[in-house]
Regions:
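N-terminal Rossmann-like dinucleotide-binding module
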Residues: 1-54
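Contiguous beta-strand/loop segments that form the cofactor/metal-binding neighborhood of enzyme cores
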Residues: 192-284, 320-328, 332
Length: 365
């Protein structure tokens, strides 16, 4: 570790595709407390290209070589979900602190094993549930804790995203439910995690998980591929606080209406709206206290923004907020949310929702 910064190595740092060029690279570039120190891709030529593009001193085409040779404070696993488990296991076995994209594993068992090993080795962990670092949700959580709308009675979450019918060849691998990158785990997982962050965890849940579009058109090849991955999730549940919850998240063909999260309390209402996924896009917060005729937009206090103004808006912003938090944790040897334990809790909820859908029974948590 440098005097004022942590050294980060990223596995999955390609220039042309993936999450690194869209979020991590532009985020870290503007973070004074985080140094992009090493890249690893699956091929030597792409690793060198990434190092040159990002201005990173070390390039590797084998992650084990990077783990053995690079002087790092944390390793980030930023690859497709099916590779999370293998790579994260190797990082943990090497004794490195770790950041892994969400979902932590392709299933609950993988998440349990990764969380157990991280605890056994006493390593610091973070998972890319970036809504937990988003200023709007941090502020919303605090408003709820301060009883801004009194006792929360119920909440409703809706998210509809377009484009389920057709995908480029690089994304049709997500058709297989076993690979773990589905509407249930990713869009729903991110959105329900933000809800739980603000309102608390579920005591019980009933779910309906289904695939409404059983074939995708693969662009460029012009072929149709069979799909087992779910695209529509509907749940009803009760939080440990007693609040009633309903949620409906779908990947639909056309004209998705975006995201809307409504919270109803004894003294008023809070609403979050977004045209995009709230974890990566811009959102607005509205409030309606008892006696008001209309909802009024709330400005998010600047104290919730922890990163420089030069960090780009969109996906890089909340990722930068996470890196700021993780840097603080590494420097102080303190684990902050969202950790592997946070991710494991979310995996357990997702598993319960799937079990409820499969069996037609309410699941207790």
């Amino acid at each position: 570790m440098g005097l004022n910064s942590i050294r980060v190595g990223i596995i999955g740092a390609n220039v042309g595709y993936g999450w690194t060029p869209r979020s991590h690279a532009p985020a870290i570039a503007e973070m004074p407390g985080v140094e992009f120190a090493a890249v690893c891709t699956s091929r030597e030529e792409t690793a060198k290209q990434s190092a040159d593009t990002y201005g990173v001193p070390l390039a590797f085409s084998n992650h084990k070589e990077m783990l053995n040779k690079a002087d790092l404070d944390v390793v980030a696993v930023v690859v497709r979900v099916p590779k999370h488990y293998e790579l994260a296991m190797d990082v943990l076995k090497s004794g490195q602190n770790i950041y892994t994209e969400w979902p932590l594993g392709a299933n609950l068992k993988e998440a349990e094993e990764l969380t157990a090993l991280a605890k056994e080795k006493n390593l610091l962990t973070m998972v890319g549930l970036q809504s937990r670092a988003a200023p709007i949700f941090m502020y919303l959580r605090d408003l709820i804790r301060e009883n801004y709308i009194g006792v929360v009675l119920s909440a409703s979450l809706r998210q509809f995203s377009s484009g389920v019918l057709s995908r480029p060849p690089g994304r049709t691998w997500q058709k297989d439910v076993e690979l773990g990158a589905t509407t249930l785990t990713i869009p729903f997982g991110h959105s329900i995690d933000a809800l739980c962050m603000c309102l608390g965890e579920f005591a019980s849940v009933s779910g309906n998980v289904s695939t409404k579009v059983p074939q995708w058109h693969e662009q460029e090849t012009n072929r149709m591929v069979e799909v087992s991955s779910p695209d529509t999730i509907m749940i009803n549940g009760t939080l440990k606080s007693g609040a009633a919850i309903s949620a409906h998240v779908s990947a639909i063909p056309h004209h998705g209406s975006g995201y809307r999260f409504e919270i109803y309390g004894t003294e008023g209402t809070l609403v979050v709206t977004s045209n995009d996924a709230p974890s990566t896009g811009s959102s607005k917060l509205w409030q309606g206290k008892a006696g008001q005729s209309d909802l009024v937009e709330l400005e998010i206090p600047k104290r919730y923004t922890k990163v420089p103004s030069s960090v780009p808006a969109g996906p890089p912003f909340n990722i930068a907020q996470l890196w700021d938090r993780f840097a603080e944790g590494i420097k102080s040897n303190t684990e902050f949310e969202p950790s592997f334990s946070t991710a494991l809790t979310r995996h357990k909820l997702i598993d319960a929702i799937q079990k409820s859908s499969d069996t037609g029974t309410t699941q207790e948590l």
